[in-house]
Swiss-Prot record:
The organism's place on the tree of life at top rank: Viruses
Catalysed conversion reaction: Thiol-dependent hydrolysis of ester, thioester, amide, peptide and isopeptide bonds formed by the C-terminal Gly of ubiquitin (a 76-residue protein attached to proteins as an intracellular targeting signal)
Enzyme kind, highest EC tier: hydrolase
Keyword Hydrolase appears in the UniProt entry: yes
PANTHER family listed in its UniProt record: UBIQUITIN CARBOXYL-TERMINAL HYDROLASE, UBIQUITIN CARBOXYL-TERMINAL HYDROLASE 10
Name the UniProt record assigns to this protein: Putative ubiquitin carboxyl-terminal hydrolase L293
Organism of this sequence: Acanthamoeba polyphaga mimivirus
Keyword vocabulary terms for this entry: Hydrolase, Protease, Thiol protease, Ubl conjugation pathway, Virion
Subcellular localization: Virion
Length: 445
């Protein structure tokens, strides 16, 4: 049975109306597209300009560069290589005061020469050498005559030639060998008595000139240079003879940044060449001082004279020193008197020392003046040659013979003379000593 419940008041609770449940509608979330990013086009990267000089591995500007107008660039044109002593570019010029020169030992021993006692040396060494007949002028041949007199007094060279049938370099032409044989016979004739009777003819002279001086046909009977003839003549001799007058040494190349030796290369020359600039600056100095200045000279290589670095291929400023390392028996000096821009001769009055003392690697050699070849004239390509050649020692006198073509005269100086008086060999206002020959004082014959 169903029982209907009633409250005490007998009220009935009305039923609540049902509210329909509406599903909640969430608002749709809109997707916001990203704003497209505008990327500017890529600009090409410009190379950084070389606004400072290009430096070498040693921190010094290289020589093979130039200012292009906007930057420093390398150049392959040697005429544009930097001359740092003259450059107007302050960025490069500021490096010059930082250069460090090497310290060079002087091989000219002035102290020993100043105290040299010739009276003692005379008692222990031979000073009587063979003199020669004078040679006439065979047609613009005074260069030849004076050269022959100088070569004659180089006893051990001449003796090697006279005593040997093969005294030249191997492989020379028959014509050149015949020319040397002609000179050999001339040496023999020059040494025959009477010595005061000059040799007035030498039929082989044209061929000798052609072969020794390497001249093409037809031979021009013009004046030649005495130094060139002597150099050519010595160059084709057997090395045993040539080495008697061959000065050997090294060309030293130093880093300008620290004065350290970079590299060196050997050289060999017949003549010790005195630069024109040194003669210009010291026209009345002694030859001893001139040689000292020459062999202690530290030359800055710049511009077209710079040296290429074998590793970087750049051209670098370097200090350059040229010094002998081996002294020969015969020491030949040539005074460079020619202006390189012309053939004009620079006149000078260099005083010729009777003796020189050189010290190399602890070994000292004393040299005695054997010959002076003098050039007369205002141009080295023209003019006249004479020479003064040592003869012997008599008592307290050294005797020399002055040769002027077929003429010869005996002159003398005191044995204690430090300088050969210039009036013995300078006879004309345009005369200047050109070639000087010294011989090892212990080997004179």
């Amino acid at each position: 049975m169903c029982v209907e419940m009633k409250n005490k008041t007998n009220t009935t609770i009305p039923s609540q109306p049902q509210i329909p449940i509406q599903p909640s509608i969430l608002p749709t979330q809109q997707t916001i597209s990203p704003i497209p990013q505008i990327i500017p086009p890529t600009q090409p990267t410009l190379p950084k300009l070389q606004l400072d000089p290009i430096l070498g591995s040693n921190g010094i500007p290289i020589a093979n560069q130039e200012w292009s107008g906007t930057e420093y660039v390398r150049t392959n044109d040697p005429t544009k290589f930097i001359v740092i002593t003259k450059t107007l570019d302050p960025k490069i010029a500021r490096f010059l005061p930082t250069f460090k020169k090497p310290v060079i030992t002087d091989i000219i021993n002035k102290t020993s020469n100043s105290t040299l006692d010739m009276n003692k040396i005379i008692t222990t060494n031979n000073f009587n050498v063979e003199n020669a007949k004078a040679l006439a002028n065979f047609g613009n041949s005074c260069y030849f005559g004076t050269s022959m007199q100088l070569l004659f007094v180089m006893f051990h060279v001449r003796n090697f030639i006279v005593k040997n049938s093969n005294f030249t370099e191997t492989g020379i032409s028959i014509d050149l060998k015949n020319a040397y044989d002609s000179i050999k016979n001339l040496f023999i004739t020059m040494n025959t008595a009477p010595k005061n009777d000059p040799i007035k003819s030498f039929p082989d002279y044209p061929n000798v000139k052609k072969q020794i001086m390497k001249e093409p046909d037809p031979v021009q009977m013009l004046e030649e240079d005495a130094e060139e003839f002597i150099t050519q003549f010595m160059s084709d001799l057997d090395p045993k003879a040539r080495n008697l007058a061959l000065i050997k040494g090294n060309e030293y190349i130093y880093d300008v940044s620290n004065a350290q030796l970079n590299r060196q290369q050997s050289f060999s020359n017949i003549f010790n060449l005195i630069p024109l600039d040194i003669i210009k600056s010291n026209p009345t100095d002694t030859l001893e001082n001139i040689l000292s200045k020459t062999y202690t000279m530290v030359e800055l290589r710049e511009g077209v004279n710079t040296i290429q670095n074998p590793i970087t291929s750049d051209y670098e400023f370097t200090y350059f020193v040229n010094q002998p390392t081996i002294l020969p028996e015969y020491f030949l000096v040539r005074l460079n008197m020619v202006d390189p821009t012309s053939t004009n001769k620079l006149r000078h009055n260099i005083q010729i020392n009777t003796t020189l003392v050189l010290t190399i690697n602890g070994q000292t050699t004393t040299y005695f003046a054997l010959a002076i070849i003098v050039h007369r004239g205002n141009s080295i390509r023209t003019g006249h040659y004479t020479c003064l050649v040592f003869d012997n020692q008599t008592g307290s006198q050294f005797q020399y013979i002055f040769y002027d073509d077929s003429l010869s005269s005996l002159v003398s100086i005191p044995t204690n003379s430090k300088i050969i008086p210039s009036n013995l060999y300078l006879k004309n206002i345009t005369d200047s000593a050109y070639i000087i020959l010294y011989g090892d004082i212990t080997k004179l014959r």
